[in-house]
Amino acid sequence: MSSATQSARFSPSPISVEHLGTIGYVDAWDRQRELAAERAENLGADTLLLLEHPAVYTAGRRTEPEDRPTDGTPVIDVDRGGKITWHGPGQLVGYPIVKLAEPVDVVRYVRRLEQALISVCTDLGIDCGRVDGRSGVWLPASLDNGQWLPERKVAAIGVRVQRGVALHGFSLNCNSVLTGFDAIIPCGIRDAGVTSLSRELGRDVTVEEVTPAVTAAVVAALDGALPVTDHDIERVTFDSATAEKTAAAPTFTTVQYG
């Protein structure tokens, strides 16, 4: 059996799913740590927390001072990987609190989460995938009404593994008001944008609509029923693009989302 079809979890027992509705970030973080402490002692069950947060900025361990809001907006510093991001209404947040199979492979675990979200977005009709060196789910640069849009992230991933147990997880922009990202450098990436399912599909896509599919895909990916496949997006390099592309390419920092 290949690693792509093996379970990423230590336990063969089913994953428990908790729907927490809208919950403050610190309260959800406390719940994560409570569950993680149990799993580290081989107690309780692997659990997928699904929720929305009120608007909040959270900063991972690699956040630089220049990535933070310039207007003094409060930021919660957290112990996950990655940099700063925004959470808020219209964004599905998932925290799989999972004891990982040994030997622990954090990169493989992140690829499982990406695969689940790529599968959901693809089934909705969105062309998306991975970008080498950048976690999450991305859309390729594309031409929209004569204007080139940069690569843009529809789902972010940031995790921490402690005592063999994964915490934190992913966020999928459904019908979020994306202006929350304007005050920061999302994930510390300056040459790309942020988007949502609703923006890309041209219709309202709610958290409630996608939650069942995301739940099923995450469980399947972690259990090896949804194999990890190569799914990199096509990169547009404007230096080597056609004359037509080069002429139409805007300065990426001027492209606004939200």
From Swiss-Prot:
Pathway entry: Protein modification; protein lipoylation via endogenous pathway; protein N(6)-(lipoyl)lysine from octanoyl-[acyl-carrier-protein]: step 1/2
Keywords, comma-separated and alphabetical: Acyltransferase, Cytoplasm, Transferase
PROSITE patterns: BPL_LPL_CATALYTIC, LIPB
GO cellular component, one term: cytoplasm
InterPro entries: aa-tRNA-synth_II/BPL/LPL, BPL_LPL_catalytic, Octanoyltransferase, Octanoyltransferase_CS
Domain BPL/LPL catalytic: 42-226
EC number in record: 2.3.1.181
Main location: cytoplasm
Active site as annotated: C187 (acyl-thioester intermediate)
CDD domains: LipB
Localization of this protein: Cytoplasm
SS bonds (residue pairs): none
Reactions accelerated catalytically: octanoyl-[ACP] + L-lysyl-[protein] = N(6)-octanoyl-L-lysyl-[protein] + holo-[ACP] + H(+)
UniProt xrefs under PANTHER family: LIPOYLTRANSFERASE 2, MITOCHONDRIAL-RELATED, OCTANOYLTRANSFERASE
Protein's job: Catalyzes the transfer of endogenously produced octanoic acid from octanoyl-acyl-carrier-protein onto the lipoyl domains of lipoate-dependent enzymes. Lipoyl-ACP can also act as a substrate although octanoyl-ACP is likely to be the physiological substrate.
General remark: In the reaction, the free carboxyl group of octanoic acid is attached via an amide linkage to the epsilon-amino group of a specific lysine residue of lipoyl domains of lipoate-dependent enzymes.
HAMAP family: LipB
Family: Belongs to the LipB family.
Name of the molecule in the record: Octanoyltransferase
